[in-house]
Amino acid sequence: MTAAELSARAEFARRLARDAGALAQRYFRREIDFVAEAKSPQDFVSAADHAVEAFIRERLQKAFPADAVLGEEGGGALGRNLWVVDPIDGTINFVHGVRYWCIAIGFITAGERRIGVIYDPSLDELFWATKGESAWCDETRIHVSPRDRLDHALVCAGYVPRHPLEEHLALKRRLHEAGVAVKDMGAGALMLAHVAAGRYDAFLEPHMHPWDASAGLLLVEEAGGRIHPYPGPGGLVAGGPVIAAAPGIFAALERLTLAR
């Protein structure tokens, strides 16, 4: 793929994320009524998720018909040039009226993350990165925090019910014993964007799907952060664990997270 082709996709993805966010806001404000259903405990899906993903898919397929699209709600096939889409990351917040959710769009070429866009409609903040071109929030370059001590760190630790609860609680105990302040804001992609912007010092989750993780991981890397290898041995569709942090605490946090 040429630099011009990649640049065109990056610009398109930024516009698309804003447009998708505007549509999602209509549902969030109940200008369009919707019903939410639980796929599993604390894992919600709503008509808003389906509508926003359909909107994104249609725009991508019209603009780049040869590209593949993999979405949280609609699935899809893999391809050399692949878009990964989470139409509303943080659906549990969205359906409860909590303003911590986002639109996440990533682009992967031959297995390499090349574009990441995360839009927070509630604050009208657009986080974006293209491989090798730094990370940005709107027109401002962003960087991970300079934190170098765990006992000064603010870390987000997400949890998914399919992961053993005992392991999650043991990890939180280790983090607290190390002096870490621990939060879970309920939207992994947006938490990754906030790590890239230096607002949080790190983000951990035992498992993330590619549509949740891809855009944010590129943001963190381009903002000077470090990440644990992703995806796991099962490949892209299977996803894997996520550790993303400021470089000054990454090694210590990785050891703490992977300890048993």
Tell me the role of every PLM-derived stretch:
Residues 1-88, 255:
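N-terminal subdomain of lithium-sensitive/metallo-dependent phosphomonoesterases centered on the IMPase/IPPase/PAP
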Residues 13, 17-20, 116, 216, ...:
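Small-residue (primarily alanine) positions within well-ordered alpha-helices
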Residues 24, 49, 60, 91, ...:
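Residue-level signal for inorganic ion chemistry
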Residues 50, 73, 87-90, 94, ...:
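Generic detector of well-ordered alpha-helical packing
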Residues 58, 79-136:
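DPxDG-like acidic metal-binding loop motif
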Residues 108-112, 122, 131-134, 140, ...:
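Short loop segments at secondary-structure junctions
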Residues 143-260:
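An extended, acidic
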